[in-house]
Design a protein with these regions (language model features):
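Short, solvent-exposed positions on alpha-helices
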Residues: 73-80, 121
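Active-site- or DNA-interface-adjacent structural scaffold in DNA-acting proteins
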Residues: 94-144
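Secondary-structure capping and boundary motifs in well-ordered enzyme cores
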Residues: 35, 52-58, 98-102
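Short, Lys/Arg-enriched N-terminal segment that forms or immediately precedes the first helix
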Residues: 40-53
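Short, conserved catalytic/metal-binding motifs centered on acidic residues
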Residues: 25, 43, 64, 78-82, ...
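Alpha-helical support elements that line or immediately flank enzyme active sites
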Residues: 60-72
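Short, basic interhelical loop/turn and adjoining N-cap
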Residues: 86-96
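Charged, often Cys/His-bearing segments associated with DNA-binding zinc-finger transcription factors
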Residues: 1-37
């Protein structure tokens, strides 16, 4: 399955540049501390087939699952939060114009990640990286 292109900044991003910045400072800090390239490498060829509808990039979806876990959100709540919160969109890698995954897509990605045994190792690796830099992220809490 081919991947969708997300994160290309457009006119709407210029209009919303300041929106959600204050609430997104923690997420921006987290984003700067994590080795996303290494995590993307661990995800490997997540969509081996090039047939069917394009899927969201695996790293983007992993970031969605991280936000969901940290904020204790259900799949429908995560979908709504991505629609509503610019800080979440920016952290995950979506521009203001990008379509975001619906709750079923989030669920399917999580199931595929679990089936490959990658869910716990990837979440633990993110937690380890943040903890090694003085941040402790738990459900609903950030401690530095």
């Amino acid at each position: 399955m081919a991947q969708k292109t997300v994160g290309q900044l457009g006119f709407a991003d210029q209009l919303t540049a300041g929106i959600g910045r204050k609430s997104g400072e923690v997420l921006e800090r987290i984003s700067a501390l994590v080795d996303w390239v290494g995590l993307e490498r661990q995800l490997g060829n997540f969509y081996p087939s090039h047939t069917g509808e394009k899927g969201f990039p695996p790293l983007v979806m992993l970031k969605v699952l991280l936000l969901q876990a940290w904020h204790d959100l259900s799949d429908p709540e995560m979908e709504a939060s991505l629609d509503d919160r610019m800080s979440f969109r920016r952290f995950a890698g979506f521009s203001a114009d990008d379509a975001v995954p619906d709750h079923a897509t989030i669920w399917r990605f999580r199931q595929r990640l679990c089936a490959r045994g990658l869910d716990q190792p990837l979440m633990a690796e993110v937690a380890r990286q943040l903890e090694s830099r003085g941040l402790l992220v738990k459900k609903g809490t950030l401690i530095d």
